[in-house]
Amino acid sequence: LYYEKKNLMFLGDHVLFDITPNITAWFGVKDSLNNYINSLKKIREFKMDTALPAHRNTKGMNVYDRIDQLLEHHKARLADTEKVVKMIPNSTAYEIAAYMKWQMRGKNWEEFPISQRWFAVGETIAHLDYLEAKGIVKCDIDSEGVHRYTLI
């Protein structure tokens, strides 16, 4: 929501300043990560003197700098996803997520809280969908209905 007279934007969870919003795959939504990236670029064009996230706080950070950080984060996450798919071809999103770089509370993937693994796998699928839409990876569904990813 943008209030033009005050150059004020209510960001919701779209831009959070001290954590990265979880961009996940949604049934019926093609390439949710691409939608998010395009939306970040679009809101970056607004003049914002005040940017208000739905929760947490801005930590005094400039909204434009934060948008740039989020775009860089997803660029790095895409590179990490592609690297892991190359390393373990014909793998599931869960297997790929286990090899990716996360800020974890546990020492390893198995100690990562199950709810956080759920978020990580959803985000991994969103990044795989993006790479698939760009023609970088392909998804094959095996005889048991399991989605498996390989580089093209």
Residues of each region from the PLM?
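Metallo-beta-lactamase
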Residues: 1-79
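C-terminal regulatory/interaction regions
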Residues: 83-152
